[in-house]
């Protein structure tokens, strides 16, 4: 039996035990995980360093190395994240609806776990912990398939999670499984594991996500890439617009809710775009601009078609001048990834048009795109940000990891 099948079977068996646990029992296990992360932080950092050194030898970019890195502060943040999940309401058993039919049948719709969740993700060790604790709290087992470049880190984290679960003696450690075989062939086999997996959630770049979406027969919760836009309207407050655009691009450029393109109304640009460009340059942002942007700032790289569709995940941004909110919406409709889109404006009609017509998980008025996040929305940790429309959309917290069932109580009714 392959490692994949064996671990998937074990996860499925564990999910049945996990589904019937009380909130208190699940929280007790999560508390042990949080404590164990802190107790073993030195071990975690030492194992992570093996991945960092291998990544440096392989020439991995500094941006990817930063995502991969575990520090004392980051392990502390992981443990705090587990504590925050403990504090969240448990959705399992929540009543969604209740009604009584004329024949006397009482029908309740309640939340239940999905079952076994397959996570496929790139070199982000924090996802190992986030996904595990969110799945456990929502009554699900999880099969983790991380990147080969984070294998030492992921093995160490899962071993720490297992020791926490063993200390609590409530949740079987088989509820959290890590695939150590990170080959593409095994990943493709995982895509077809309908007998054991209830859903697949990919987290990573566009190529990873699209390969899962196109090839999987297991249902997929698609976490899309973030080609996000900030549109500065003609009436935008200059100081606010510059602050929002710069924040959306530079506060943390390597994440999916960072802005990748700034669209600027031509009337606003006449007076203020040079200030925006100056502030971006202070933050060391490389700009790719259209001809009108280059006319103001000749040092800007000329933008080509590929720039409008690129998720840079770095200190790079595309800039374009538009003549109306309609032109901005059309550009976003063509190049956007349906993630997070913002308008900075004081014109109510334009704001309404933008918020209504832009197709995205989250649309903003006079705020940075950087708030599309489970913690910022008050959901706690997230397992990803869904850009699809079925089952879940936007930041996916605990509720997104549940399904529902109808519970029907009768008094002897039979169908006539």
From Swiss-Prot:
Its EC number is 1.2.1.41. It catalyses: L-glutamate 5-semialdehyde + phosphate + NADP(+) = L-glutamyl 5-phosphate + NADPH + H(+). The keyword NADP applies. The keyword Cytoplasm applies. Catalyzes the NADPH-dependent reduction of L-glutamate 5-phosphate into L-glutamate 5-semialdehyde and phosphate. The product spontaneously undergoes cyclization to form 1-pyrroline-5-carboxylate. Belongs to the gamma-glutamyl phosphate reductase family. This is Gamma-glutamyl phosphate reductase. It comes from Halalkalibacterium halodurans (strain ATCC BAA-125 / DSM 18197 / FERM 7344 / JCM 9153 / C-125) (Bacillus halodurans).
């Amino acid at each position: 039996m392959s490692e994949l099948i064996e671990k998937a079977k074990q996860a499925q068996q564990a999910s049945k035990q996990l589904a019937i646990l009380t909130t208190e029992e699940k929280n007790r296990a999560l508390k042990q995980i949080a404590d164990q992360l802190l107790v073993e932080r030195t071990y975690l950092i030492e194992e992570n360093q093996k991945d960092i050194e291998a990544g440096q030898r392989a020439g991995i970019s500094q941006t990817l190395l930063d995502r991969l890195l575990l520090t004392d502060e980051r392990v502390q943040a992981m443990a705090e994240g587990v504590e925050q999940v403990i504090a969240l309401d448990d959705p399992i058993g929540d009543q969604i609806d209740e009604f009584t039919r004329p024949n006397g049948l009482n029908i309740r719709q309640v939340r239940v776990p999905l079952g076994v969740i397959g996570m496929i993700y790139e070199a982000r060790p924090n996802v190992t912990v986030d996904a595990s604790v969110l799945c456990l709290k929502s009554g699900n087992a999880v099969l983790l398939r991380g990147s080969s470049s984070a294998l030492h880190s992921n093995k160490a984290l899962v071993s720490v999670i297992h020791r926490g679960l063993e200390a609590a003696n409530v949740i079987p450690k088989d509820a959290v499984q890590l695939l150590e075989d990170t080959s593409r062939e095994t990943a493709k086999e995982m895509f077809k594991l309908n007998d054991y997996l209830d859903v697949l959630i990919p987290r990573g770049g566009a190529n990873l996500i699209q390969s899962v979406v196109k090839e999987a027969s297991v249902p997929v919760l698609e976490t899309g890439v973030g080609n996000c836009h900030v549109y500065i309207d003609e009436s935008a407050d200059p100081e606010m617009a510059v602050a929002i655009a710069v924040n959306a691009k530079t506060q943390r450029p390597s994440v999916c809710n960072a802005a990748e393109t700034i669209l600027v109304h031509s009337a606003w640009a006449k007076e203020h775009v040079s200030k925006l460009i100056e502030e971006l340059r202070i933050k060391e942002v490389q700009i790719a601009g259209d001809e009108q942007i280059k006319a103001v700032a000749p040092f800007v790289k000329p933008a080509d078609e590929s720039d409008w569709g690129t998720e840079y995940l770095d200190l790079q941004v595309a800039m374009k001048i538009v003549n109306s909110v309609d032109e901005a919406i059309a550009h976003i409709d063509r190049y956007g990834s349906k993630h997070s889109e913002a308008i900075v404006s004081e014109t109510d009609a334009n704001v309404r048009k933008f918020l209504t017509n832009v197709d995205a998980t989250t649309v903003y008025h006079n705020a940075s795109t950087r708030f599309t996040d489970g913690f910022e929305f008050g959901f706690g940790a997230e397992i990803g940000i869904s850009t699809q429309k079925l089952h879940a959309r936007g930041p996916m917290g605990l509720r997104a990891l549940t399904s529902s069932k109808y519970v029907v109580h009768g008094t002897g009714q039979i169908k006539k």
